[in-house]
UniProtKB/Swiss-Prot annotation:
CC cofactor note: May bind 1 zinc ion per subunit.
Main location group: membrane
Cited InterPro entries: Helicase_ATP-bd, Helicase_C-like, P-loop_NTPase, SEC_C_motif, SecA, SecA_CS, SecA_DEAD, SecA_motor_DEAD
Signal peptide: none
NCBIfam families associated with the record: PRK09200.1, secA
Enzyme Commission designation: 7.4.2.8
SMART domains the UniProt entry points to: SecA_DEAD (SM00957), SecA_PP_bind (SM00958)
Gene Ontology CC, one term: plasma membrane
Top enzyme category: translocase
Binding site for Zn(2+): C832, C834, C843, H844
Protein name, as recorded: Protein translocase subunit SecA
Amino acid sequence: MANILRKIIENDKGEIKKLEKTAKKVESYADAMAALSDEELQAKTEEFKQRYQNGESLDQLLPEAFAVVREGAKRVLGLFPYRVQIMGGIVLHYGDVAEMRTGEGKTLTATMPVYLNAISGEGVHVITVNEYLSERDATEMGELYSWLGLSVGINLSSKSPAEKREAYNCDITYSTSSEVGFDYLRDNMVVRKENMVQRPLNFALVDEVDSVLIDEARTPLIVSGPVSSETNQLYHRADAFVKTLTEDDYAIDIPTKTIGLNDSGIDKAEEFFNLENLYDIDNVALTHYIDNALRANYIMLRDIDYVVSPEQEILIVDQFTGRTMEGRRFSDGLHQAIEAKEGVPVQEETKTSASITYQNMFRMYKKLSGMTGTGKTEEDEFREIYNMRVIPIPTNRPIQRIDHDDLLYSTLDAKFRAVVQDVKRRYEKGQPVLIGTVAVETSDLISKMLVDAGIPHEVLNAKNHEKEAHIIMNAGQRGAVTIATNMAGRGTDIKLGEGVLELGGLCVIGTERHESRRIDNQLRGRSGRQGDPGESQFYLSLEDELMRRFGSDRIKHVLERLNADDEDIVIKSRMLTRQVESAQKRVEGNNYDTRKQVLQYDDVMREQREIIYAERYDVITAERDLEPEIKAMIKRTINRTVDGHSRNDQEEALKGILNFARQALVPEDAISLEDLKEVGEVTKRSVNYDAIKVYLTELADNVYDRQIKKLRSEEAIREFQKVLILMVVDNKWTDHIDALDQLRNAVGMRGYAQNNPIVEYQSESFKMFQDMIGAIEYDVTRTMMKAQIHEQSREHVNERVSTTATGNIQAHQADANGQEIDFSKVGRNDFCPCGSGKKFKNCHGRKQF
């Protein structure tokens, strides 16, 4: 272990030496740049662009370009980047993570690589954790970029598509991670290229990169729409049932936070819902509602996982920042289950139209880099998932903060009393205190205890984060006491007030350890910025969440031996700190495995998503007639359907093909059974199915030509073809995403049968994807052949093609011959005799199977 640590430290030292060498090159240009007039310095940007166009690489331009930014910052902002900031900028340019301590000037550091990469003209995205920071940084640093001749845009969720397009077309665009992700998804749902807002993704520089790429990585970005509201009743029924259970009826696995019914719970469910077998295949949907109701009632905790707003809405609490996540909802029906639990109006369940994880979103950039104060603990994940190294940058001045060993109490009550006593002592001498809590309810409890102790203070949690920047800025003033849930207020510096240095600087008190060491380090890092003095102290109890889940029995025995009756007894030792960090490493390992699994599932979907989005983009941008593509779809649909029916009994096969032709290809009176028998040279023993394929293809080509002639102009034809394909693709893709969600839930259970769920998911999702392609081609064929076409102006084509853009398409979907079809002899995997081209189990046999 010691050898591994030594190797890591030596590697870091080697990197620092290389960075210092390049930084010195940058510094060597300082005098030359200082001698230039404003106009000459500003002209450098155009010179760099020209040199880049002439073949010089950005790496070659780096020393001079960084020097231009340094001199520009001095003249425009009154700031001159230190050597350590130049080193951080070099790390960022090369696509790695720069670990820079709080207060070391990350925002100014970013200006150098952002400027250099903007020279290519392909766009730079600066990603922040919230819109307040996007606006603040774009306004402050935008002065410098604009002065140097670069355009700066801010991409906010409230902006119109035209404003977003303008922001993305700038050299430098400030945005949040979620907004970039949603814009990407929305761009792949539009009908026309001119409605897209993004350019191809080039270079992203992510501020607080650990928060975005690690903490958010388990949360997929989802664009969804409502489904039938009849399901609301099931949420209430499942909730009513779950509330009748006792602790003996279900089992909770605390480390993984999963829950399931015991045998007694299953018996009660079967009695409550009047079922013979709860886990019968017909009850799959019901078990989903029961599972969600169990999680909502016995796993999800009010004021910790969510809060109920005054408007009677359930708001998610971000476990890493303590902020409420406006507009976000738990997926898979869990949010509705919580609404039923809390007795607030149950909002309509939604169906996913498009989704992507943060991991796959950011891996699409040509180059990705990031800054954070705490990234080293997650280095393996950055390297394995994003191919980024974490390089710690030395501080400009030595750190003077004193980090005290943890204090452990036996009960929560004893711990909180000790916290209040410590705060009171420091408040009385005027030292500012920042109290970090993990949950909203903890901050409320401590606030009440401080009020009782007569200590004035500010509370910063999920309930009032609008004021957070202002509260955090004043947290370093003499006598200030501030309670912050996790690291709300991250990104805003705490500057020390007059006379505070002499009192020991800002004291940070943690009321419990977070499950991630990184979050603890972020809290500690609020104190001791830029070489200021400071202190940090964590208070723990055996009743803390982390200690209950992963705490060592050894610690509990030590406390019991010391004094079982005195709850105010306290342990302070290095052994305790090591035990706590060991528990945190176990949790971090679990969380990493979870994120990795999310990525493995999304990687399967990513391949399919990229195929669909590439095909979509090809259709949207096509200036050509799409007739060859559509006729190829029609031909494949005919071949697929005829081949499918050819495996059946001869008479049934011919009837199935006839139904298909009448329903999807030609008018009813244009083809008869006798026609097929004649073309197929039918005898008692054989049918020439190849001849039938050729015959049907010729008929379909004639119908296609007649349909197209109804459109008078080339533009109208192309418009019709595009909307036809996009409408079908979007509908089928949405259904496919929904089916993949259900498949993922189903294969999870197969792990118990010794099958690898990921392998099963890959295999079955591939088959489903092939089926979806077949269904797309069938629907394009049927709609093309059966549409009632009439001219309609371009403006009237509805934008939301995924559900309503029928534009000038109105398809006949009734059974062509109006006769009842006998399904009694049809096998589960046979093609449906209705002529849809689907297997019976996925068509008219769906209810039966």
